[in-house]
Amino acid sequence: MQYVICTIRGKLVILRSDKLGTTYGIYELSKQIGVSPWYWMADAPIQKHEQLFARSGIYTDGEPKVKYRGIFINDEWPSFGTWCQNQFGGINSKAYAHIFELMLRLKANYFWPAMWDSRFNEDDPLSPQIADEMGIVMGTSHHEPMMRAHKEYVYRKDSIGAWDYSTNKHNLDRFFEEGLERNKHYDNLIT
């Protein structure tokens, strides 16, 4: 069981069994009182109430059937990138905080960030911190191993050398090790 919403001695209580349990419980309660997960991203109206009541008893969704549920921001330009540029000054932690909130409200917990011209961990060092604080597990796409964005290699290509493991093993190993070291305190699924 990930979270339980219940009443104890007349008080509404949200109990959790893991890192995201309280968050999911709060967002479930929010949804039940009329706040759409899309309230910010799609300007979905929030239902207003003069009074709210909670029935005595216990409510839970139980454990999710799939452990990692998430999205991949693919082909981010021009749509997503332009929107982020206009709203937040770029694809950065401010933009990702809204994406992460939407994901959590939809009970998602796994994210592959934008990759065309982005370096999630380097463009804004707050991005991985916010992901971790919010309980989002980070991953990378199939061609971005060891938590290294492709653009991280592109920006270092002159110092790293060829993307060829048969001739450049030492430099590529060091590049990958640095990515793992940088992200070791965060919750990641490594490709």
Residue ranges: model-predicted function:
Residues 45, 65-191:
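Aromatic-lined carbohydrate-binding surfaces of glycoside hydrolases
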Residues 1-63:
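Contiguous, structured surface segment used for ligand recognition
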